[in-house]
């Protein structure tokens, strides 16, 4: 009876996790609509999408029945994530403009596929129980997942340095926090350290981002309002479209101008 209830809770949490993860995967869609309209990737980087693709590939391998049984929901969302990231990277490949950039993307993709394929072959041929395979693939998956959640550290550092939230979208921070939280719960029903630990780390990073948002929200509004007045920006400027108006490396300089330093 208890086992059936735990399975039901796990399934409900997993479905919720799939929905939130889907929202997270689709969150860059406006960026790629902008790229298609402009027919240029401008200064956007493919690295976040390459990193997410690698994480999804390893997660999909981890969730296979012959590696970690009863993880259908994990395989499902990982497969969806792989598809979405491939679409994004294809758009990036088409509009990146320089052949050198295309070669770099192709090389990184090749290395990722070869790495995951090699890992799969080694695990499935050299290890003969699902427990052994779970540990081997789980450790690799745990590392990549934790690295993905730690990727906003540079943005968080910029927020603290500039006292501006312009490059840390609130909605993305909230969805990331919820995603990590739901998959942490999923990793505890029953306990799976390779899901619970990295997603627990993700919860911490997500919470820190929300704390930063609460800390610097007022100062960001003041900075943007002053900047609009001083630099002659026209129209209503919101947090969501500041990216289109200011390059990250110029924020400290602009903030000094606004402050009159």
Curated annotation (Swiss-Prot):
Entry keyword Transferase: no
Disulfide bonds: none
Keyword tags: Cell membrane, Membrane, Repeat, Sugar transport, Transmembrane, Transmembrane helix, Transport
Gene3D superfamilies in alphabetical order: 1.20.1280.290
Localization, UniProt: Cell membrane
One Gene Ontology cellular component annotation held by this UniProt entry: plasma membrane
Topology of the protein relative to the lipid bilayer: Multi-pass membrane protein
Coiled-coil residues: none
Name of this chain's protein: Bidirectional sugar transporter SWEET6
Record lineage: Eukaryota, Viridiplantae, Streptophyta, Embryophyta, Tracheophyta
């Amino acid at each position: 009876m208890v086992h059936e209830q735990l399975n039901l809770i796990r399934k409900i949490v997993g479905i919720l996790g799939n929905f939130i993860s889907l929202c997270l995967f689709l969150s860059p869609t406006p960026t790629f609509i902008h790229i298609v309209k402009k027919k240029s990737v401008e200064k956007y980087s493919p690295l976040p999408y390459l990193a997410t693709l690698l994480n999804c590939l390893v997660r999909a391998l981890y969730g296979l029945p012959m590696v970690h049984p009863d993880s259908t929901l994990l395989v499902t969302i990982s497969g969806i994530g792989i598809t979405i990231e491939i679409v994004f990277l294809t758009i990036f490949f088409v509009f990146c403009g320089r052949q050198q950039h295309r070669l770099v993307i192709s090389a990184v993709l090749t290395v990722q596929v070869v790495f995951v394929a090699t890992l799969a072959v080694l695990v499935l041929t050299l290890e003969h129980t699902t427990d052994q395979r779970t540990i081997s693939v789980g450790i690799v998956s745990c590392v990549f997942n934790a690295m993905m959640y730690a990727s906003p550290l540079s943005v968080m550092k910029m927020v603290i340095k500039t006292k501006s939230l312009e490059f840390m979208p609130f909605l993305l921070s909230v969805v990331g926090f919820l995603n990590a939280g739901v998959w942490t719960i999923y990793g505890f029903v029953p306990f799976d350290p390779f899901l619970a630990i990295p997603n627990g780390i993700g919860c911490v990073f997500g919470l820190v981002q929300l704390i930063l948002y609460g800390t610097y929200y007022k100062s960001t509004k003041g900075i943007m309002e002053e900047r609009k007045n001083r630099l002659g920006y026209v129209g209503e400027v919101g947090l969501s479209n500041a990216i289109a108006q200011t390059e990250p490396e110029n924020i400290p300089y602009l903030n000094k101008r606004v402050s009159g330093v």
